[in-house]
Amino acid sequence: MTDKNTSEQLWTGRFTEATDAFVEQFSASEHFDRRLYRQDIAGSMAHARMLAEVGVLTAEERDRIVDGLTRIREEIEHGQFQWSPKLEDVHMNIEKRLTDLIGEAGKKLHTGRSRNDQVATDIRLWLREAIDGILDELLRLQAGLVELAELEADTIMPGFTHMQVAQPVTFGHHLLAWYEMLVRDQGRLEDCRKRLNQMPLGCAALAGTSFPIDREQTCSELGFDRPTRNSLDSVSDRDFAIEFNAAAALVMTHLSRMAEEVILWASPHFGFIDLPDRFCTGSSIMPQKKNPDVAELVRGKTARVHGNLNALLVLMKGQPLAYNRDNQEDKEPLFDTADTLRDALTAFADMLPAMEVQREACYRAARAGFATATDLADYLVRKGVPFRDAHEIVGRAVRYASDEGRDLSELELDELQQFSGTISEDVFEVLTLEGSVAARNHLGGTAPAQVRARVAEARDRLRLLMGK
């Protein structure tokens, strides 16, 4: 009988038989959590330096650990690291390799910590970096929309409610509506980043540690705002992952709405835009097809992000304090959401500013649905007609024009006057599309002057955020 651990696993002292081979495969996570290796190594280096400061490690042991971890990072980056599912996860794979490289000092690294606080720290570090990358792409998309909005500040298109022509708007105004969605998304992601930037390291398994650790030191080295305040909560909390996924689900919802409009606009029935060939695909059977696959995929991938949010919520809803192995299942949906969101933003940041707006088609569509009917009602109100009466009068005029196959602006003055004697020659000034959009010249309105003012504000804001 020997007390020497001959297994690859680093926790077998209490066990009398080897882990079942299927259970090893079933419970291993190294095939997906290995992408945390940089964060895991950074956390271990900070932990080793802190242990040396408080006298748990010698300076020589600290240096050997840091050097060994540096070598392991290089091995992983160069594809030379041998991952083993028998070691379960990224943490044990790295620790085992460290011990193989430097000997006994490697076995001391885990003093004063657990995989519970270790993985919680790793995920926060990883997600913090992922959010930064996502925000970069989000800002790039915002900037592209703002530039296109300026180009299309005077372009008139139909605005829709219930997918029916409602009132004329400018294309630039519509693009700035997308921009406003993304500004809110940015704020949610930034708030999420602030809340996740607290360090669990040092909370150990669930109760803390009896070693004289200095959590403020590791917190500072790893760039966290502060250490967490309760060890039980720290190792079991996945709020930050859920919050990120909720924010991501909203971003994807907005991108999906944009995608739906792009798909409609690119169809021959609308013809509002032409997408560059590089963002489209063809058909294996129909030679004429130019399919907006990028937009369709963004719309489709929204479903998986929504599904990931639900998976995380359901994962956490029944767990008692503190850490449970269920939490291993947090990483794949989290990784997938971050990857999917960043890819979708990259695709749209490249594609949407490259849309070629078909201005004449937009204008024709705006004229086709009596889009200036509200302007005629407003005209009557300014002439002293109560709004409800004006609404009724214009409704009858629209029905007449529809039966005649003409727009309101194409009716003769005497035809309009049969519906209200208050109508005079000046009515035609308000029945043009140009007059309609120009009249909405107030903060938030669709007038070209307002679009340009909002573009200037947005450009100043983005210049500060992007350093350009």
Swiss-Prot record:
UniProt signal peptide: none
Keywords recorded for this protein, A-Z: Amino-acid biosynthesis, Arginine biosynthesis, Cytoplasm, Lyase
PROSITE patterns noted in UniProt: FUMARATE_LYASES
Record bears the keyword Amino-acid biosynthesis: yes
Example of a GO cellular component annotation carried by this entry: cytosol
CDD domains: Argininosuccinate_lyase (cd01359)
Pfam families: ASL_C2, Lyase_1
Catalytic activity line of the entry: 2-(N(omega)-L-arginino)succinate = fumarate + L-arginine
GO molecular function: argininosuccinate lyase activity
Pathway: Amino-acid biosynthesis; L-arginine biosynthesis; L-arginine from L-ornithine and carbamoyl phosphate: step 3/3
Gene3D superfamilies: Fumarase/aspartase (C-terminal domain), Fumarase/aspartase (Central domain), Fumarase/aspartase (N-terminal domain)
Entry's localization field: Cytoplasm
Presence of keyword Amino-acid biosynthesis: yes
Primary location recorded for the protein, binned into one broad class: cytoplasm
EC number(s) per entry: 4.3.2.1
InterPro entries documented for this protein: Arg_succ_lyase_C, Argininosuccinate_lyase, Fumarase/histidase_N, Fumarate_lyase_CS, Fumarate_lyase_fam, Fumarate_lyase_N, L-Aspartase-like
Top-level enzyme category: lyase
Entry similarity comment: Belongs to the lyase 1 family. Argininosuccinate lyase subfamily.
Official protein name in the record: Argininosuccinate lyase
Species of provenance: Alkalilimnicola ehrlichii (strain ATCC BAA-1101 / DSM 17681 / MLHE-1)
Origin organism lineage: Bacteria, Pseudomonadati, Pseudomonadota, Gammaproteobacteria, Chromatiales
